[in-house]
Structures are given as C-alpha cells and as structure tokens.
Design a protein with these regions (language model features):
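Mg2+-dependent endonuclease catalytic cores in nucleic-acid-processing enzymes, primarily RNase H-like
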Residues: 1-8, 23, 52-167
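Acidic, metal-ligating active-site segments
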Residues: 33-58
C-alpha cells in the first residue's frame, strides 16, 4: 500500500463479521486502545487482537469537549479504566493504550503522566519509519513552572507500515 492509498473497500467488506459493538468476539485475546486528540473532541477506539493478526473493532467513542479543559480528559480516563466483556463472559481490561500527542501536546503529556501506568504510551505519528512503533524518545517537560526530573517517553508510530501490516 502506497502512502495516501486507501485499502480496497471490497476486501474490507469481505472481512466483516457480525458481532455486538462493545463486546469482544471469541477470537479476541487482548485489547488495545488508542485515542486521537482534536480541538473539540477526543476520538478513542478499542481493538481486540487474536491469532494471525486478526483484529476486531470493539468500540469507538467520540468524546466531545474542549481538549484545553479537564472534562474531556476525565472522560478519556474513565474509558481507559473500563473493561469489556469477552464472548466467554470474562472481563478484559486494556493491555495497552496509545495516545496521539500531535495535537494538544502538553495536555496529552499531562494525561499520560497522570495515568502513572506503563501500559499507557504517548505516540506521535510519522509518515515513514523503520518500524511500526519506533524507539521511544525521552522528553522533559516543564509543568506548573517546575522542571520534571523524568519526562515521559514518546514513541513514533509509522502510518505507512501500519497500512502494510493490517490491510
């Protein structure tokens, strides 16, 4: 898949399955979440992954609100803390959560830092990269006028490689 190319819609239609949104299909072994920050909202998705790179969209939410204010970030924190019901009846939490830091960067860093959870990662999209998820870059951010001794790490995420992997 070339950069800027969309996958063949017919291939995607042929891959569809019938399952209830918000539940994890039987083949789903682990859940990952990701969120994209915009000025007036955060769009968050939860995906289940199974054997052979099989994946299912479990849920997609649009959390409306000014991303310069705490309310929408609190909604994202609540979503991140949830678990989803597997077809077996088991409750599955997120194994990993990635937050795009390309917009509202400082607010996104603050969110990741406040989670105090190594499963939550800051990511920055790049057009090209050697790997889907690159080596993390340590950042040192000032917050409230104080220099942080240990900044969070930001991982690069290569969109072109993601298309090759998943389509």
């Amino acid at each position: 898949v070339e950069e800027g190319e969309a996958p063949d819609w017919q291939c995607l239609v042929e891959r569809r399955e019938d399952y209830r949104i918000g539940s994890v299909p039987a083949g789903g072994l682990l859940l990952v979440g990701g969120a994209d920050v915009q000025k007036d909202r955060i769009e968050a998705s939860v995906w289940a992954f199974g054997r052979g790179k099989e994946s299912w969209l479990v849920e997609h939410r649009v959390l409306m609100g000014d991303t310069a204010r705490d309310t929408v970030w609190n909604s994202l924190a609540e979503m991140r803390a949830e678990s989803w019901t597997h077809a077996s009846g088991a409750a599955l939490p997120l194994a990993r959560f990635a937050l795009d830091t390309g917009f509202a960067t400082q607010e996104a860093y603050t969110f990741v830092r406040a989670c105090r959870d190594p499963r939550v990662m800051a990511v920055k999209g790049v057009a090209r990269g050697a790997a889907l998820i690159g080596t993390p870059t340590a950042i040192d951010v000032s917050q409230g006028g104080k220099k942080l001794r240990r900044g969070i790490k930001v991982f690069s995420a290569a969109g072109g490689i993601a298309k090759l992997e998943f389509y």
